[in-house]
Structures are given as structure tokens and as C-alpha cells.
Regions:
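Beta-sheet repeat architectures centered on beta-propellers
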Residues: 1-319
Length: 319
């Protein structure tokens, strides 16, 4: 009943039916105000985090993480979520930083990189054999083959992201690195050699010194329902409220999308937003420290759901 006053309770109680009974590992980090539940032998983790100013909890949220492989074990060590996962016949050790937002600036070395890339299982290209380059262009099919040190996951697309090569960092050539450009990378197998690689449309051998490849994080956040609230008073759940426009301020963030679903519908539709005028330096990762998005809604507050999504290889900070 949309006219009934909502029952407002602690968020940790509201998710009891959302958490599966197969969760078998728990890890905590008091200094990060975080609890992590792990469903081993699946790809899912459930993270609860809150912020307390010393008097009360000002922010609390549950999030569900899906990793590319099957989780064998996951623990919080210092400020990292350290995960051992399995895919195909291989095991991967990975670390996800909790308190350092990626700036978008990444510099590639010959075999690694510096900076935080918002991709999972991210790696520089690696030669499959001493006689084969790590990045090869197939002129006949107009594709670039990118070889990696692990076996790509079957039927799962990855992301190729351009960064700044070490030799170009801080020089005029940095502008030619096209930092922040990305393209879909499709897993493939060579029939003649059985080498596994990622395929990207177009020629990228000129950017080989700055290429990194990994799997993207698909972000999806459904925003809570809006209610009328008088200054200094609680929300009035019975008041009639029409939402004309929603303005959403985000922290260090790249591109994001917004989707709206009418109440009772199963279809999410894109909402075309507007942003305040601003600039960022050309040929750099399109990440700014703060951005404000304005969304035209023109709906009763009980007539729609609104969510934020992103499948781009850039950081997103909604807090």
C-alpha cells in the first residue's frame, strides 16, 4: 500500500532476507568501520560499512560485490580486501583498496603500473612466447591481439584501458598517450597455437607501452525513495510530493548513467542528465574531484524508482 507509512528500521535488519544462508566467512575491520561476509565457492561478497562522528551513525550501507572468479577465501588485511579466487584451472591473488579512491592517473612500466586502476585482474600485456610480441596487430581483420599472463574467463568481456607510459610521463608526449581511452576486449583462442588472448577492434600497437587489461566493475545503486521533510523535523511520509528535478552531487567520479523505472513496471529507462559546466585537461582520464548531475523527473515520489549505474573503467564515489 503506497499510502501506508513506511516502517523505518535499522538498515542491517532490513537486509536479513537479502543475505543468503550460504555465507560461511566473516571478516571485520574496526578501523574502517566495515564488516564483510563472504559466500565462498561463489563470486559474491556482502559488505556493510558505516560512518560514525563519535555520537551517532551518519551513514550506513550494504553493498553486494561480484568478482570475476569463484572466491576461495577473502580477508581484510590492513586497508585492503585480499581475495584468492579461481577461474578455469588457475588461482588469482588480488587486493582491493578500501580507503584510496582511484585518481584516474595511471603510469605503465614495462611489466607493471603505478596508480589505482578501477578494474579487476588488471595486468599489463605479457608475451606468450619469446618470439611473439605481447601486443600484435592483425591487419587482415583490423584487430589487435593482447596477450595476458592468465587464462581469460570464457564468454566474459574485459576492458582495454590506455594509460601513460613511463617514458612519456611528465613530457609533451604524454598528450599522445590518449590516457583514459577504453575499448571492449573479447576473449579469444588461437587455433594454431592455443594461445588465449583478448581481441580489440582497431590498431593499438602504437599504444602498447601504455595498455592495461582487466575486468570492469558494474556499479548499480538504487536510490531510496524521496519524502517531504521540513527543516529541523523528520520526514512526512503522508505528504503529497512531486519531484520536479533531482540534483545529485558525487565525489571523485568518471562517467555514470541514470535509469528510472515507473512503479509496477519491469523496464528501466535511461534518464538524460545535465551537468554544470566544467573542464578537464585533454588526453587525461575523465575523472573530476566533484560533479553535480541534474535529472528531470516530474513524477510523484511514489511513482518511480531511480538508480545510478556505471560499467565504465573509471572510479565512482557517491559519498
Amino acid at each position: 500500500d503506497v499510502e501506508q507509512t513506511p516502517i523505518v528500521i535499522d538498515i542491517s535488519k532490513a537486509v536479513l532476507e537479502w543475505l543468503p544462508d550460504t555465507v560461511d566467512t566473516l571478516s571485520t575491520s574496526p578501523q574502517n568501520s566495515l564488516v564483510m561476509l563472504v559466500d565462498r565457492d561463489t563470486s559474491y561478497m556482502y559488505v556493510y560499512r558505516f560512518y560514525n562522528d563519535g555520537r551517532e551513525d551518519l551513514f550506513q550501507a550494504w553493498t553486494k560485490w561480484q568478482l570475476p572468479g569463484t572466491i576461495q577465501i577473502a580477508e581484510i588485511l590492513n586497508n585492503d580486501v585480499t581475495v584468492i579466487s579461481q577461474h578455469e584451472d588457475q588461482y588469482t591473488l588480488g587486493a582491493i583498496k578500501l580507503d584510496e579512491l582511484p585518481s584516474g592517473d595511471v603510469v605503465s612500466t614495462s611489466s607493471s603500473y603505478t596508480g589505482d586502476v578501477p578494474l579487476d585482474m588488471v595486468t599489463r600485456p605479457v608475451k606468450p612466447h619469446s618470439s611473439v610480441d605481447a601486443v600484435v596487430y592483425d591487419e587482415t581483420n583490423d584487430i589487435t591481439k593482447i596477450y595476458v599472463p592468465y587464462t581469460p574467463i570464457d564468454s566474459k568481456d574485459a576492458v582495454m584501458l590506455l594509460t601513460v607510459p613511463t617514458a612519456d610521463d611528465g613530457t609533451a608526449a604524454e598528450l599522445d598517450s590518449d590516457q583514459g581511452y577504453w575499448a571492449k576486449a573479447i576473449e579469444r583462442t588461437e587455433t594454431s597455437t592455443n594461445y588465449r588472448y583478448f581481441e580489440v577492434k582497431g590498431k593499438f600497437t602504437d599504444y602498447a607501452d601504455g595498455i592495461v587489461v582487466g575486468y570492469g566493475y558494474d556499479l548499480e545503486v538504487t536510490l531510496p525513495k524521496f519524502y517531504f521533510q521540513r527543516q529541523g523535523a523528520g520526514a512526512d511520509y503522508t505528504a503529497a510530493l512531486t519531484i520536479g528535478k533531482v540534483k545529485l552531487a558525487v565525489g571523485r567520479t568518471g562517467a555514470i548513467r541514470f535509469k528510472l523505472r515507473p512503479t509496477g513496471s519491469n523496464e528501466w529507462k535511461d534518464v538524460q542528465h545535465t551537468i554544470e559546466a566544467g573542464v578537464y585537461q585533454g588526453d587525461t582520464s575523465p575523472v573530476v574531484n566533484e560533479q553535480i548531475f541534474a535529472l528531470p523527473i516530474h513524477q510523484r515520489n511514489t511513482n518511480f524508482e531511480l538508480k545510478v549505474t556505471s560499467d565504465f573503467p573509471y572510479p565512482v564515489s557517491l559519498v
